[in-house]
């Protein structure tokens, strides 16, 4: 990618259909779309191009963390591209979730595209990799439980 993008790659020991379901169904999103120990409330989930999504997460300090965006592109079992704001910490980014079947496994390439290189560097210093790492660990656990 470029100097504005953070890329995270994960391989899930599950079919692309199952990973897609876990990624796109609100009842599953509520189980994994937050760091460990935090429950996600799916407030809005209009899964179509132009549709909005909004998830709320109560933080241990009593504040509420809001994740929201709008779907830009959806290609079933292949990719989901969305605008995204993670308030109060990160705003004005694009997230690209790219799924690839590899035998009985699914490879995920997750790109976080920032408006500037400086913003990307700031987000890395704030621990963005640890946050998403925890989220994808929870997704992996959910997929294994469903499977």
Q: What spans do the regions from the language model cover?
A:
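Hydrophobic pocket/interface hotspot
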Residues: 19, 29, 53-55, 71, ...
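A solvent-exposed, acidic/Ser-Thr-rich amphipathic alpha-helical stretch
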Residues: 35-51, 55
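Ser/Thr-centric signal marking residues that sit
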Residues: 24, 106-109
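Intrinsic-disorder/low-complexity, polar/charged segments enriched in Ser/Thr/Lys/Arg/Asp/Glu/Gln
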Residues: 3-9, 16, 40, 52, ...
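A generic structural motif
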Residues: 14, 24, 50, 76-77
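Hydrophobic ligand-binding cavity/cleft-lining segments
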Residues: 1-39
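Hydrophobic-ligand binding "helix-grip"
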Residues: 30, 44, 58-103, 113
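A conserved amphipathic terminal alpha-helix motif
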Residues: 114-147
């Amino acid at each position: 990618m470029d100097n504005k993008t953070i890329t995270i790659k994960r391989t899930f020991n599950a079919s692309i259909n199952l990973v897609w379901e876990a990624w796109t169904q609100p009842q599953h999103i509520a189980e994994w779309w937050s760091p460990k120990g935090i429950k996600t409330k799916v407030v809005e989930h209009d899964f179509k191009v132009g549709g909005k999504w909004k998830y709320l997460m109560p933080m241990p300090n009593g504040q509420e963390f809001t994740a929201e965006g709008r779907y830009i592109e959806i290609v079933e079992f292949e990719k989901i591209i969305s605008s995204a704001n993670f308030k109060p910490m990160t705003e004005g980014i694009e997230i690209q979730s790219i799924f690839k079947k590899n035998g009985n496994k699914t490879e995920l390439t997750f790109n976080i595209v920032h408006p500037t290189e400086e913003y990307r560097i700031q987000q890395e210093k704030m621990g963005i990799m640890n946050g998403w790492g925890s989220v994808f660990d929870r997704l992996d656990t959910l997929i294994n439980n469903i499977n």
